[in-house]
């Protein structure tokens, strides 16, 4: 839902005060992984006064250079060479997943799973992985177990947006429905 995306997004700009410990906690709770060297979206690395982060949806990762607890510069960088690139004034970091991964959310997911699906939940890899904080492949199909209300793409668009459908929409919907029910 838009409320989750907005509530789990972070904005940083040059000159801003930054508590690296809070940043690290926020990134982990938003679904980012702490690594030795940032190479792919959803990863971050803290080395002294340097924070590298590759936001979801971004074409390039960013390097925040800190002077004490203030963001001195924000630059893009090359993952292969690790060389800094363009200077940026501010960045937006979106959540790493479309769903929360904190302990309360994982517990709510598991509770909703038990209410929704019959049988022993411990026989499900998805259920067990979520208990360990692992987002299994295809977890996004279980989004309604994380939220009381979900959203569609249309919920993010202005009310007067014109939507044009091309091709055989009914066939695509039938194929998608079959794929989902076969899981």
Give, region by region, the residue ranges found by the protein language model.
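ASCE RecA-like P-loop NTPase motor cores
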Residues: 1-183
């Amino acid at each position: 839902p838009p409320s989750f995306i907005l509530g789990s997004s972070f904005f940083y700009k040059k000159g801003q005060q930054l508590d690296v410990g809070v940043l690290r906690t926020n990134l982990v709770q938003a679904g980012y992984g702490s690594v030795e060297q940032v190479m792919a979206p959803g990863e971050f690395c803290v080395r002294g006064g340097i924070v590298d982060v590759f936001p979801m949806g971004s074409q390039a990762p960013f390097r925040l250079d800190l002077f004490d607890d203030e963001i001195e510069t924000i630059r893009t960088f090359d993952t292969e060479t690790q060389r800094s690139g363009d200077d940026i004034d501010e960045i937006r970091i979106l959540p790493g997943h479309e769903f929360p991964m904190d302990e309360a959310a994982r517990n709510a997911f598991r509770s909703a799973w038990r209410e929704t699906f019959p049988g022993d939940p411990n026989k499900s890899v998805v259920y067990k992985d979520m208990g360990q904080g692992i987002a299994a492949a295809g977890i996004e199909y279980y989004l309604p177990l994380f939220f009381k209300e979900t959203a569609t793409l249309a919920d993010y668009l202005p009310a007067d947006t014109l939507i044009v459908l091309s091709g055989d929409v009914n066939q695509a919907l039938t194929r998608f429905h079959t794929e989902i029910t076969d899981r």
